Amino acid sequence: MNSKNVLLTIVAILMAVVIGGELCVYFGYDLYQSENGIFLRHKVYIATYQNMSENELRQRTETGDADAMAMLSCTIFNAHKGTEYKEVLELAQKSANNNCPSGKNMLGLLYTIGYCVPQNLQKAFDLYKDAANENEPAALNNVGNAYLSGLVVEKDTIQGLMFLEKSAIEGFPTSQYQLGTLYYNGGKTMQKNVNKAIEWYTLASDQGMPLAQYELS
């Protein structure tokens, strides 16, 4: 796969992360027993922000709520696909400047695709890494994929899988699906393990991911 195709693949994943409504708060966890042992599984709770109208989000941003800023940036981004709105960038920047992990992840996306800013994959990676250091699930996924592709940083499969697994354990369905696929296919990346593949597919399927549901059908 050439660098252009790798970039498009990463962007597609990032777009799915935002457009798929994954910009939310993850917290709480329970223990899940499987044939291979006990896995820590985070319950995913959709933040109140995701159910708010644009006007409600604007009211929250006026109070300095950095999470609401990130969600509003995402909301406007989704509502005007194909058209660049400076407010999307301004909100993401303000949220990130207030040390909001979701805001950093959103700003990283904008630098990845060159939305209202010159495309800068290194800056995008740095933002993802900062957010990943605070265990932001989508950012952990983005960092993992960056290491796996080797496009922005030196390719490091071990690091990539580590971040991907952290994201999956945090409850991020995209990472759970990816791990399921890696275990199902096997190869140089990891040893084939159908049972583990089914476990990860099941976790992603439980959160409504169509691709995982298809693999289990």
Question: Which residues fall in each region the model found?
Answer:
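Short coil/turn connectors between adjacent alpha-helices in alpha-solenoid helical repeat scaffolds
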Residues: R41-Y45, I76-Y85, Y115-L121, S149-T157, ...
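N-terminal leader/linker segments that initiate helical-solenoid repeat arrays
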Residues: L23-C74
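N-terminal Sec-pathway targeting helices
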Residues: M1-V17
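Hydrophobic face of amphipathic alpha-helices that form TPR/SEL1-like repeat modules
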Residues: M71-A79, M106-I113, V117, L127, ...
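Short helix-capping/linker turns of helical repeat alpha-solenoids
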Residues: T63-D65, N78-H80, N98-C100, I113-Y115, ...
